Structure formats: C-alpha cells, structure tokens
Curated annotation (Swiss-Prot):
Catalyzes the conversion of 3-deoxy-D-arabino-heptulosonate 7-phosphate (DAHP) to dehydroquinate (DHQ). Binds 1 divalent metal cation per subunit. Can use either Co(2+) or Zn(2+). The gene is aroB. Its EC number is 4.2.3.4. It comes from the Bacteria. Pfam families: DHQ_synthase, DHQS_C. Keywords: Amino-acid biosynthesis, Aromatic amino acid biosynthesis, Cobalt, Cytoplasm, Lyase, Metal-binding, NAD, Nucleotide-binding, Zinc. One of its GO terms (molecular function) is nucleotide binding. It is an enzyme of class 4 (lyase). Its main location: cytoplasm. Pathway: Metabolic intermediate biosynthesis; chorismate biosynthesis; chorismate from D-erythrose 4-phosphate and phosphoenolpyruvate: step 2/7. Zn(2+) binds at E186, H251, H268. It comes from Picosynechococcus sp. (strain ATCC 27264 / PCC 7002 / PR-6) (Agmenellum quadruplicatum). This is 3-dehydroquinate synthase. GO terms for cellular component: cytoplasm.
Length: 365
C-alpha cells in the first residue's frame, strides 16, 4: 500500500508518505524538498545497523552530503546531555540553517532530533523516518519534540514540524515484538478517542500482537487511519490549545507510571496502555461510560499483549505528586482525557485526588 496524508498547517504543512520498500528511494523523496546540501542522520546503533547503509547510499546518490550521529537506545538517554552531543556533531560538520537533521529511529530518536533541529541555529530542517510502529502512528507526526527532565517526561521541548515524514512499513519486520505491541497502544488510543470503526476492526482481527501474526491488510489500514486521525487533529490545533489534548488519552497516568519507575520498567506504549485502563476505570466511576465499554477497551489492550494494571510497588502519594508536574496542568488542576463512548472523549479537570486514589488503591495494595 502506498498512501500520502497531508498535515495542513499553512506554511508549515507537510506530507506523510507511506510506501513499502521506500528507504531505498529516500533520496528521491527528499531531493525536491529544498532541504539543503548537508544531512545529519541521528539514529541508534541497532537501527542504523539495519538501515543506515541503505539510507546513506540513497541520500548520497541524490546528491546529499551525509554524516551520522548515533545515540544509545533507551528512554534514559532522552535528555539534554544527548542533545548537546547532537549539537557537537552539528558544529563539527558545519551544519547551516539550510541543512537537515534526519531522525532514523523510534519515538525517542524522533523527539530528540526534532528538538535539536528546533534549537540549532534557531531552527533547521527536520525529516522524520520512523522505524517503530509507535513512531509511525504517533511520535513522528505533529511536531512535538523534546527531552525528559528528572522531574517528569517531556518537560523540556518545543513544537517544531518536520518537513516530511517517510514511513516504510517493511522495516517493522526487524522490530522486537515488545516494541510492536507498544505501538499498538497508540493505535488502540485512536480507536477510543477518534475512530470507533478502527476499534471495531481491531476487535474483530484474529491477532494484533506482532508483525508476524497481524494481517498485512490490517496493518496497512492501521498505518493509514492512525496517521490520518492524528493529521486531522493536529491540523485543527497545532499547539494543543484545545482539541489536540485528546491525543494525551492514557498519557497522564501513563507518564506518571513511566517516570516513577525511572523509565526502566515500561516502554512508553506500555505506560500508555496502563494509563488508558486507569482512565477508563475513572470514566466508569464518573458515569461517563459503561462498565461494558471499559471491559471492551481493556480486553483489546490485553489482546495486543499489553499491561492494564499499575505496578504494586508505587505509592499513591508519589503518583499524585507526579501528576502535578504533568504538562496539561492548568491553574493547578490536572486535566484528564476521559472516554464517553468508543470513539469519543472529553477533557476535564474535575477528577479528584480521592477518586484517583480509589481507582489506584486496589492495584497498589
């Protein structure tokens, strides 16, 4: 399947191209985009080992001058120290304002590369080439860039849109099963917040927990529909002043769980899965949706091989304190995205600490 989705943001508009075996032609895709002569690829050693040579050869064949900067894999490297090392390489290779940073990797690589691009020389070109399912359907689209702070996830960052996103679904064949499942958390999220038909199709599928077992046509549909959903939301609200906040479904408590486990116990999608299960339980307690809908959501999360329960070694007080550092806090109140039915959510700051405690207590006792 080849498909192109346009993110409409005026002068910052760009295309998301989904095309199998497209890494071999990446130079052809990028050459018409006025991205300057120099390209600095930012990746991690494992991903670069799989696809670096292919990307470099295609870019060089298209006339680009290419250099590389590698960052160790893992959320623990998503920090300002890693950004400074990207700056050092950019300086060493004399990147100019017309030059391009190219993110070849998952969400961590994309977030850091985008932030470096936003801040080096006050902004240079940025291209996303996501290699994980999570990055393909979520992190590579929308222009959120940044790094973590010891006090919370993604507290340092900027909105900075890429010039282009290239998705080659065939690279998922080398993705570890755990990472594929993590990406499915974001896909399920789109089903809950935006696309009830996608949710139903995931329910009806025989298997959705690995690249090897998922129906290829369903995977094509997942990529196209997820990118379209995010593009539609971002086009209406680039800087999260309203509608875009719904994309944070599952992320409020999910980020807290990730942070309190020092980004070592769960990958991001697993945190989101736990956060969605907890948000669903809160919505049920508030009579926003039914117990049956919560059960449908949690069953789909489990079908994807993802966790639904908060680890029992966390203190409720620590979770509540961490929530106060969430980026969505407004006037001192934590804002939650909560489902009202499959395919629709609302944003509310009327979730009390007592209610959160009641929902968390059974899991933490």
């Amino acid at each position: 399947m080849d498909a192109t989705t346009r993110v409409e943001l005026g002068e910052n508009s760009y295309d998301i191209a989904i095309a199998k075996e497209s890494l071999q032609q990446i130079g052809t895709f990028l050459r018409p985009l006025d991205l300057g002569q120099k390209v600095l690829i930012v990746s991690n050693p494992e991903i670069y080992g799989h696809y670096g040579e292919t990307v470099v050869n295609s870019l060089q064949a298209a006339g680009f001058s290419v250099d590389t900067h590698l960052i160790p894999a893992g959320e623990q490297y998503k920090n300002l120290a890693s950004i400074e090392k990207i700056y050092d390489t950019a300086f060493k290779n004399r990147l100019e304002r017309s030059s391009t940073l190219l993110a070849l990797g998952g969400g961590v690589i994309g977030d850091m590369t985008g932030f470096a691009a936003a801040t080096w020389l006050r902004g240079i070109n940025f291209v996303q080439v996501p290699t994980t399912l999570l990055a393909m359907v979520d992190a590579s689209v929308g222009g959120k860039t940044g790094v973590n702070h010891p006090q919370g996830k993604n507290l340092i960052g900027a909105f900075y849109q890429p010039k282009f996103v290239l998705i080659d679904p065939t690279v998922l064949k080398t993705l570890p099963v755990r990472e594929f499942r993590a990406g499915m958390a974001e896909v399920i999220k789109y089903g809950v917040i935006w696309d009830a038909d996608l949710f139903t199709k995931l329910e009806a599928a025989e298997q959705i927990d690995s690249y090897a077992t998922i129906d290829p046509d369903l995977l094509d549909l997942i990529l196209e529909r997820s990118c379209r959903a995010k593009a539609e939301v971002v086009s209406q609200d680039e800087r999260e002043s309203g509608l875009r906040a719904i994309l944070n479904y599952g992320h409020t408590l999910g980020h807290a769980v990730e942070s309190l486990t020092h980004y070592e116990t769960f990958v991001h999608g697993e945190g989101v899965a736990i956060g969605m299960a907890l948000a669903g339980a809160i919505a049920t307690r508030m009579n926003l949706w039914t117990t049956a809908e919560t059960q449908r959501q949690d069953a789909l999360i489990k079908k994807a091989g993802l966790p639904t329960e908060c680890p029992n070694n966390l203190a409720i007080e620590a979770i509540l304190e961490t929530l106060q550092s969430d980026k969505k806090v407004k006037s001192g109140k934590v804002r939650f995205v909560l489902p009202t039915k499959i395919g629709e959510v609302l944003i509310t700051d009327q979730v009390s600490a007592d209610l959160i405690t009641d929902v968390l207590a059974p899991a933490l006792c």
